């Protein structure tokens, strides 16, 4: 019985090639669009969901107009952090963060290039940074650095890196204060290391 159904369906496909092609292409296109929409929804729902209070964490953007067009960007003046705290007391925590860039990290003869951010002290709570080892408040001192577990292994192998010194760009000595996991793929904040925002203010006044 089932075999006959397939035979009849095949004959109809051959007999009405144009209509069959239109139907098949339409079905394929519909399924592809549905999959794309599903992936987009999944991305929207899961992005930063590992933050403890992800539904209360927002990024401040700046609008600028050029030649009649409006643009949004992440670049903000340094004082904005303190201004937000002063003028909006409902903001429980505020953490400045730069765009991120690659720096050379050097330990002895080892030299690797990794991507990271200067970031504010309150980022630990805001972004639910899980401290695997080291200081629970690792951004208190400006000349410090937090490494992901992967970066720590790349620099120190099996040694405990906490308390050790990493030289950044062959010029700045930073003490490793904590180790954190590498952020998940669903995180909008990507990094191999994190450095206190206070150091950024010192070297980029």
Question: For the regions a protein language model found, what residue spans apply to each?
Answer:
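A short amphipathic helical element positioned immediately N-terminal to and/or at the very start
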Residues: 5-14
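Membrane-interface anchoring determinants
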Residues: 11-12, 20, 40, 47, ...
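Short, strongly hydrophobic transmembrane alpha-helices
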Residues: 16-43
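Membrane-proximal extracellular/periplasmic loop immediately following the first transmembrane helix
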Residues: 37-103
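Short acidic/polar micro-motifs at solvent-exposed secondary-structure junctions
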Residues: 62-73, 96-122, 128, 132-145, ...
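Mid-to-C-terminal secondary-structure elements
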Residues: 120-132, 147-205
